[in-house]
Structures are given as structure tokens and as C-alpha cells.
Curated annotation (Swiss-Prot):
Domain of life: Bacteria
Positions in coiled-coil regions: none
The organism of origin for this protein: Haemophilus influenzae (strain ATCC 51907 / DSM 11121 / KW20 / Rd)
This protein's UniProt keywords: Cell membrane, Membrane, Transmembrane, Transmembrane helix
Keyword Transmembrane: yes
Main location: membrane
Protein name (Swiss-Prot/TrEMBL): Uncharacterized protein HI_0825
Length: 244
């Protein structure tokens, strides 16, 4: 089945408008988490502002901890949103509390799938970063690892949606999405480019114009709204992707 991305975006927007109460609840939740994360990061940076030239004295542990907590919370909100969208699409949605419980039960698997998707890419990036720190040129192997990692990510980035939308085990989920993607690599690449490259670039460009608290808040709300909308796009694309 051919996938028309213009139609996917239009259908996703119609869904967002029709379910705006629930969607805006998720926008609010994500905005609160992002704002709390920004305040926490600012606090860590402020404490270490006198150590900019002495990275050895910077509290790296606190920074990594705050980033990890933020990432876990963001991943959970995304999984919660996808579960809710799935239930609404099946006309089986009741409350946010119900989908929260369903997401919580499957969240350990979501974390494992997320790690599996990014691990090869992170290995390549880690090796390249280590080479730069030692003032050496990154090896060919690190470049190959990054390219393989990107390819691996493209092939598996729908596993989380499938895992949350079904009761299948992790191994079944990976196998099904991998096999399904054997003949649909092109549309997978376009989807990945849209969701994981173009949207983040747009958000980054908007953030670059930030110069006051009010504008920061507007950008934060828009970012949260765009991220929740992209969850709808993801689910809609996944639904078409899995059709014969």
C-alpha cells in the first residue's frame, strides 16, 4: 500500500482537532516536564558557572542524572500518548488513568527497545567523540558504526508503537517490524527524516530566536504541541505501514 505523507499529515491534524481535549492534556503534561527539566538544567549550570574553563570540576554526575530523568519521563509521556491514541482509534478509550496503567505495564519493554534502537549509533558516536577528546581523527570504524546505527534506527523506530499497540513480546515485535520493513525501506526513511530530523531542526531554529521568558514559554508550548502532534503522525503512519 502506497503511503501519501501529505494525507498522513492531514489525517493526523483532523484527529488532533477532533480529540483536542485529550491532545492538549498531553501537551500540558509534556510542557510541564520540559519546563521542569529546563529549570533543573539551569540550576546545575548556575552552580558550575565558575568552572567553565575547568571541566574536571563540573558536576557531570548531576547533569547526566537530570538528562536521564528527563529522557525517561519524556519517553513515558510519548508511550502514554501513543497508547491513548491507539485506544481512541479503536474507540476503546476511557480515561488517561487507564492508559497510564497500560503504559506502565509495558514501559520496561519500551526502554529496552529505545536502547536497542540507539545503541549501535551511540557506539559509533562514542568512539568518534573519544577520538576528538584525544585530538585524533575518528576512525573509519566509528564512521561505519554510525552509518550502521542510523540504518538500524530507521529499520526499528516503529517497534515501540507496535509493542504498545499489541500484546506481542519484544522478540516478536522486533521480528515483525524488521520483516515488514524489508520491502518498505524508502517510506521508513522518509518518515524518519520527517520526525527525527526535520522537526528537531525546526524546533532548534525557533529556539535560537529566544530572548525573553515570554518567548521561551511560547516556544516551549509550541514544541510540546508539535511533539504530541508527531505522535499522532507516528501512529497514523504505523497503521498504514502495517497494512497489506
Amino acid at each position: 500500500m502506497l503511503i501519501n505523507f501529505t494525507q498522513v499529515l492531514q489525517d493526523s491534524w483532523n484527529f488532533f482537532r477532533n480529540q483536542k481535549k485529550i491532545m492538549l492534556q498531553f501537551v500540558a503534561i509534556l510542557f510541564i516536564v520540559q519546563s521542569a527539566s529546563a529549570l533543573l538544567s539551569f540550576s546545575v549550570n548556575d552552580e558550575n558557572k565558575n568552572d567553565v574553563l575547568n571541566l574536571a570540576n563540573t558536576d557531570i554526575t548531576s547533569f547526566i542524572f537530570s538528562v536521564a530523568i528527563t529522557q525517561i519521563l519524556t519517553s513515558f509521556i510519548a508511550a502514554w500518548g501513543l497508547t491513548s491514541i491507539h485506544k481512541i482509534s479503536l474507540q476503546n478509550y476511557r480515561t488517561l488513568g487507564e492508559t497510564f496503567s497500560l503504559t506502565l505495564r509495558r514501559f520496561a519493554g519500551v526502554i529496552l527497545l529505545d536502547l536497542l534502537m540507539v545503541a549501535p549509533m551511540l557506539l559509533g558516536l562514542g568512539e568518534a567523540f573519544a577520538a576528538l577528546l584525544t585530538k585524533k581523527s575518528p576512525s573509519i570504524m566509528s564512521l561505519i558504526a554510525m552509518l550502521v546505527g542510523v540504518w538500524f534506527f530507521v529499520r526499528l523506530n516503529l517497534t515501540v508503537v507496535h509493542y504498545l499497540s499489541t500484546q506481542e513480546a519484544l522478540s516478536q515485535t522486533i521480528r515483525k517490524i524488521w520483516m515488514r520493513g524489508n520491502t518498505r525501506k524508502g517510506v521508513l526513511f522518509i518518515y524518519t527524516l520527517l520526525v527525527y530530523f526535520l522537526v528537531p531542526i525546526l524546533i532548534f531554529q525557533l529556539s535560537a530566536f529566544s530572548n525573553n521568558a515570554v518567548f521561551d514559554m511560547v516556544i516551549g508550548i509550541f514544541t510540546a504541541l508539535l511533539n504530541i502532534f508527531m505522535l499522532v503522525v507516528t501512529y497514523r503512519f504505523y497503521s498504514l505501514f502495517m497494512k497489506d
